[in-house]
């Protein structure tokens, strides 16, 4: 009875957040009828009834996307300023990536790694040469890449650095986010992620982000095998470290024989105006994690890049994935990377991001207290009042034709697809400005 009441309360809350036009058009449509396709309200109610309540989506029911735009089931068009957390950097349904997927799906989709396939090696050669690493280990999701990096770091710590077996430590930064598996939440400092899910993975330690003295103290422990860090913290609210931080990380890790692992799942692949966010300081990590835009949003593909000294510490049978390195995912990833190259999307992200931040800085400071970011990974901080907070701003942005999502309470991440043009940036800023001025 209590769970039913909670479900009804959730549905009621969703209804209150929907477009007034949606609510009026569908107020009596609590189930699909023969008169037409499902309404937004029907879709909200069905998900609430049959799906786990582990997400709190913005109430909009989308059915298609193209480039920088998405459309809901009622046909309303929106600017996409989330890009599926950066996964659709190449734009929704990019024709080259779609064509690559179609061409492969009729030939061969999955073999497992029990056999060779004719696409994996092509992908491996391409991505390792592109990023100048000896080897790549293909996986599917971003969190799998993180898990893989942790295993590689521990094995390297034992076989190369000489750490006593099962004593290896990995250091992370406060505010990190790389997924919601038990390993990932074991490094988290966000109670929403970890509270109630212990016991946690041993051998994980955290230090303040953007704090080189704290890192130096931590690395003096001879049992530390690696420091894993986001060049810009995405989920924490697009936290950009001080200039020189990544250079300092590289120097300290080298000095203390500790692996520098760059989590570029969200920041990499042109998002910040460079191929990798670490490229802003011209540093080379020992390991790089890639995902999200590695498939252009069509298919889960992730990767760990490193050199032989690290990668070859793992032998056959010691790590793998049924789907990792499958021919369909590899063909899609090749096309997704080619789009980034051929369309100069890192350069476009750099230019469009500068324009976006310049315009966002003009927003009234009594509502928007801060603007930060690099390339097209940006955020605004909302001054919370009784009548205004980040969630309410996002609801009103939706009503005005732009989709964004709060992160960490008062922060709104603004990360459109990298194919966005200047006139589209300026039109989007007009929507943001109109929305902010309405509070």
Curated annotation (Swiss-Prot):
It comes from the Eukaryota. GO terms for molecular function: identical protein binding; ornithine aminotransferase activity; pyridoxal phosphate binding. GO terms for cellular component: mitochondrial matrix; mitochondrion; nucleoplasm. The modification N6-acetyllysine is found at residues 49, 66, 107, 362, 386, 392, 405, 421. It holds the Pfam family Aminotran_3. Residues 1-25 form a transit peptide. The modification N6-(pyridoxal phosphate)lysine is found at residue 292. NCBIfam families: Orn_aminotrans. Homohexamer. Catalyzes the reversible interconversion of L-ornithine and 2-oxoglutarate to L-glutamate semialdehyde and L-glutamate. Belongs to the class-III pyridoxal-phosphate-dependent aminotransferase family. This is Ornithine aminotransferase, mitochondrial. The gene is Oat.
């Amino acid at each position: 009875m209590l769970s039913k009441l909670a479900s009804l309360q959730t549905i009621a809350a969703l209804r209150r957040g929907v477009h007034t036009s949606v609510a009026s058009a569908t107020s009596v449509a609590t189930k699909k009828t023969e008169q037409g396709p499902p309404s937004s309200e029907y879709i909200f109610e069905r998900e609430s009834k049959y799906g786990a309540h582990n997400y709190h989506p913005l109430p909009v029911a989308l059915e298609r996307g193209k480039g920088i735009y998405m459309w809901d089931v009622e046909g309303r068009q929106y600017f996409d300023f989330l890009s599926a957390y950066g996964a659709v950097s190449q734009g929704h349904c990019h024709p080259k990536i779609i064509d690559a997927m179609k061409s492969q799906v009729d030939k061969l989709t999955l073999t497992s790694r029990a056999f060779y396939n004719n696409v994996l090696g092509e992908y491996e050669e391409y991505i390792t040469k592109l990023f100048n690493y000896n080897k790549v280990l293909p996986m599917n999701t971003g969190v799998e890449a993180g898990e893989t990096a942790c295993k590689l770091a521990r094995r390297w710590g034992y076989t190369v650095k000489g750490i006593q077996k099962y004593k290896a430590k990995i250091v992370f930064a406060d505010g990190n986010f790389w997924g919601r598996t038990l390993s990932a939440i074991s490094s988290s400092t966000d109670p929403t992620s970890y509270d109630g899910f212990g016991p946690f993975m041993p051998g994980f330690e955290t230090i303040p982000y953007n704090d080189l003295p704290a890192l130096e103290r931590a690395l003096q422990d001879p049992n530390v095998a690696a420091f894993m860090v986001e060049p810009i913290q995405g989920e924490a609210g697009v936290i950009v470290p001080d200039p020189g931080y990544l250079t300092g990380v590289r120097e300290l890790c080298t000095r203390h024989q500790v692996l520098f692992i760059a989590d570029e799942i969200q920041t990499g692949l042109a998002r910040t105006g460079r191929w990798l966010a670490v490229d802003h300081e011209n540093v080379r990590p020992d390991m790089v994690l890639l995902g999200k835009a590695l498939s252009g949003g069509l298919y889960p593909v992730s990767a760990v890049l490193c050199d032989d000294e690290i990668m070859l510490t793992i032998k056959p049978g010691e790590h793998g994935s049924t789907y990792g390195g499958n021919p369909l995912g590899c063909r899609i990833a090749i096309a997704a990377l080619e789009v980034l190259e051929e369309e100069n999307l890192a350069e476009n992200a750099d230019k469009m991001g500068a324009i976006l931040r310049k315009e966002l800085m003009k927003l009234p400071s009594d509502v928007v207290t801060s603007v930060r970011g690099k390339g097209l990974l940006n955020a605004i901080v909302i001054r919370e009042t009784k009548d205004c907070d980040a969630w309410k701003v996002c609801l009103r942005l939706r009503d005005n034709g732009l989709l964004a999502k709060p992160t960490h309470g008062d922060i709104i991440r603004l990360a459109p697809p990298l194919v966005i043009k200047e006139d589209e940036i300026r039109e989007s800023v007009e929507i943001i400005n109109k929305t902010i001025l309405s509070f």
